[in-house]
């Protein structure tokens, strides 16, 4: 049995969780401040929706930079502290990683759009016919395999992620 088989997961959207700056937007520091409460609730794993740099046109799933924290939410140092504080309480972290799409602001998208024959050209599917692939299902109602956990060994990384 894996640790996540009977774990209690708690999902938090950082931007709407707890504001620590007075700007009306939740922050990673706000999440840190509530960890004792989450531990008291019996949470084993905190699940964070995307908090990466994004224009926020799709609730943060439109990621512009996978290596940066959205500036309204905090810094990479705040994220590192969150991971350390979770682990100090015996809790784990799961994040959403939207690898199958990016923001239109992402450098790869911009490069592909500018030069579809260039090195990033095949990172995206370009076409003018919306009915070109009518048989493709966008939502897979018969499977939940997309909600998998990938386990990591590094303390600096997430304990798992949802792809």
Summary of predicted features, one role per range:
Residues 2-154:
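Acidic/aromatic-lined carbohydrate-recognition and catalytic surfaces
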Residues 152-163:
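Single conserved hydrophobic/aromatic residue that forms the stacking wall/gate
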